[in-house]
From Swiss-Prot:
Keywords: Aminoacyl-tRNA synthetase, ATP-binding, Cytoplasm, Ligase, Metal-binding, Nucleotide-binding, Protein biosynthesis, Zinc. It comes from the Bacteria. PROSITE patterns: AA_TRNA_LIGASE_I. Monomer. A motif ('KMSKS' region) lies at residues 656-660. This is Isoleucine--tRNA ligase.
Amino acid sequence: MKPKHYPDTISSPDFSSLEKEIIKFWQENKIFEQSVEKRSKDNCFVFYDGPPFANGLPHYGHLLTGFIKDAFARYQTMLQKKVERRFGWDCHGLPAEMGAEKELGISGRTEIEKFGIEKFNNYCRTSVMKFSSEWEKYVNRQARWVDFHNDYKTMDRSFMESVIWAFKQLYDKGLVYESVRVVPYSWACETPLSNFETRLDTAYRKKTSKAVTVAFELLENPQQFKQKCKLLAWTTTPWTLPSNLALAIGKDIEYCAVSVHSSVSFQHVTLESREKETWIPLSRTGMTEEGTETVTEDNEVSLVNNEIYIFAEDYLEKFIGHCEQNNIPYENCNTKLKADDLAGLSYKPLFNYFKGTKNAFRVFIADYVTGEDGTGVVHTAPGFGEEDFYLCQSHDIPAICPIDNSGRFTAEVSDLTGIHVFDTNDAIIKKLKEQGNWFKTEQYIHNYPHCWRTDTPLIYRAMPSWYVAVTKFKERMIELNKRVNWIPTHIRDGQFGKWLERAHDWSISRNRFWGTPIPIWKSDNARYPRVDVYGSIAELERDFNVKVNDLHRPFIDSLTRPNPDDPTGKSIMRRVPDVFDCWFESGSVPFAQVHYPFENKEWFESNFPADFITEYIAQTRGWFYTLFVLSTALFDSEPFKNCICHGVVLDVKGQKLSKRLNNYADPMEVFDKYGSDALRFLMLSGSIVCGGNLFLNKEGSSIRDVLKNVMKPIWNSYHFFTMYANADGIKAEVCKDYKSTIDSYMIFKCFEAVESIQASMSNYNSQEACKILIDFFEVLNNWYIRRSRERFWKSNLDQDKTDAYNVLYTVFYYILRAAVPLLPLITETIWQGLKYKEISVHLADFPQLERYDSELIAKMDLVREICNSALSIRNTFNIRVRQPLGSMTVYHQSSCSFLESKPLSVVIPKFSPVIPMRDTGTQKEKKWSNAEMKTSMNEYQEMIKDEVNVKELKLVNSLEGIASLELKLNFPMLGKRIPDKVKKLVQYVKEGKWKQVDNEQVFLGNESESYIIEKDEYELLLKTNSEYSSVFGDNKGIVILNTALDDALVLEGLARDVVRLIQEARKQADFHISDRIRVIIKTEDEKIKRAINTWGEYIREQTLSLSLEINIEIGDNFYSKEYQDLIVGIELNC
């Protein structure tokens, strides 16, 4: 019995079960901890682990981000970097508070205060971490290595102290101020939001609003008119009309006037067919062209004789259309007005709520008013619009904001008090109609901002807030952004760069409860003003003479002291009630997670900015942005050097994955069914890692494809090795000398793949690295192993057979380490099975390569291309590979200019543990001469003949009469550069008036008119005249097969079929690959009999058969299998 040095493997393993064994092995042997501890702290690779909330389970987006982080962390660890992977938790803010409110059955500020701030915050402290153990299970199962025991939480005292330190730094630099401004406000959360929070994900979504056109009666007429005049203004927020204090018009807009001149009474009706409110003359009630008119209210109004309506001329067509549609008499005054004719005029307030407001109810010119939307007259409520606020502020009009924190009208709007603003639109419109100020109502669909936590529509509200003066250092942020390597590259100047250009000052205060408190104390007496800002616990303990164990409310609110600037000693320093926007905490992660500057000062300053960060692409307006703001303001530095902005995982319909749609499988179910390596590879190999999206169906078919096309080929090569090595009792070694051409090629091809994977991973391109790995195993399985199978099958264990085993063993030794970041579990399984030196592949270093022969690789790759082209012809015409053919001809002419578009390259590599981000390796181009081509073919002709299964190989150094070159224009590219010339170029191509001048350019035209087109504006295609032909190697040449069959070729093909059937029967009988057998064939087919008689020796050799007999009785001890034309019987030779 030969010794077995490797585990017995099966051809189709349960990858999920194998993975669970590996994860258990890692945990029991502390492999992750060892991989970190063995690296020097002086050689760190730093990446920031963006903190998720632990009050919900991980979804596929979290898994994707985790896979990317883990892949590059493993890669850098293998480059001998120390990569600590502290997990972080986002604990504060709206997500935590909203979850706690729901669980406690309370809602809103009043109920929280009644419940008790201390009790509420203590509940938040517990509930925010309730899914942390579940997170740990998911993260561990996805084979992601993180440190859960040394994690950071934004609610930790140390983290919060660093946050208040950062704020004090900003304050001392003059980058913090308090101001009343109009800000996005979530009435559902009772807190303001920052501008960038309104740009997160799908914050903007479709909303149908009642848009109303309102007539404002002027108290002073323009000089041109003596009749009563009204300005028409259009708004999508009728609920803001009670707070109207001004009207705005455009400086460059031309206004017109229309007279409505007959006294007609109108009644309010609903046109059922149009689902729209309007007014019609009482004399015309009944049927109209639009449908049945149903009276819904008894309100009547009259248009006074000769009222003048004024609006932008661009609105005239809509005005007339509305009048004619509703039979409202009108007459165009043909009078044009300028903005100066209207500016300064006063008008009658719509309502009396704020009638006496100083400087209000006048018409002002504003730069932001256009005639494109609406009427060219903008209703202005300074308490509810940013532009409104600044316009009124410039005219000394106060910002009136008569709503409470929950979005309900206060007592100032007496008849609507306590009603939510969005529920008052109908009542306000009704009142406008009764007063004669209403002109028209319509349903208006528009994109409107919603709260990112509650999905409720936001309002804009004037309120006090603390701001970071981002606009003061915005230009520096733009400069620092140029230093960052963004993936994809367009993010730098595109999505993120443009976001920086539009950056506003950042509202960082939230009038909430669970968060880091803003460390500002103010005097409670305006006569003795004083502001104190604290940046450490020590400062607080010094001034308030108390031990500070917790920085949360309400403890922090209880810290008061007499105002040192008040000689009376009566005024008290009290903290402002706000807490920080939780995004301020997220932006503090780089320094706060290590308690800088109170601890780890030297380490942080030596390892900032971070080497790497990744999140999904919308974080360009979220976390990436806040990191940039604080990093620039505090350290005058970019926060990270490399950033991957990945895309989003969607279902096959392009919808986000959600429980409501039931359009995704639980990740744990996917792990149990397919394993996590398959999902990992699917994500790392797709365009999603560079900003695209991944479409995933609930059945997981794309994950199943990875099992079939990636995992299984890798396993097959390993299974092949262990099965044959155990059968031969061989213990393979990592080899240094490669005797045969194919062995050398396979080792060098492995080196090339490893080097390319290293270059891709150093450039943060896992997609390319995955492709290289797939291509490599295609070569290993379908070229080397298949081409070498007879070496493994032969009975004697000679040096040639030993070399084949050693080559496979060596290839695994290198490629497994390179594949670790992409497939950490299957590589570990195979590594342990092959018993290399390290107990875990994750404790090994990335391969240090030897120099290799790139020219040999180029030659063999060319051979493979020729073979693949020939086999594609067989496939096209359904000619099985087992059927030998008479001949094939390779036509090649490297001296032809059109064949030099992409010459073969010989790469002289530069070896080092780390390949630079930009490849600086020297490349030399090699053009194949006719003589070299023929030498190459002669050297490899037996290999080609055997692979393609042809008897003769011919090489012809000419393409004349066989192929022609076709020029294909790239219309999109040409259309951008010379759109008016494209038609002419097409004509020149049809007439054949073109030639390639060099590898880059093509000349088109004649002596009188000509054009040069560049490489990216065209494509050259080699076209052949024979149907049994194929182009190979990017226009390098043509392969033509002779498909004619004579009797000898047919018999040989049948003999090969018999071999296949015998081997299939052997497999089904569960015989071992090395078992010697006896074979009986029963058939009445004369051609098969002749084939067996002619090729008997060949059949016996190929099937390890000691005997091969025809049409004798198959005994009971034989395993038999019936096929279409014959029966195969096989028996073990005992």
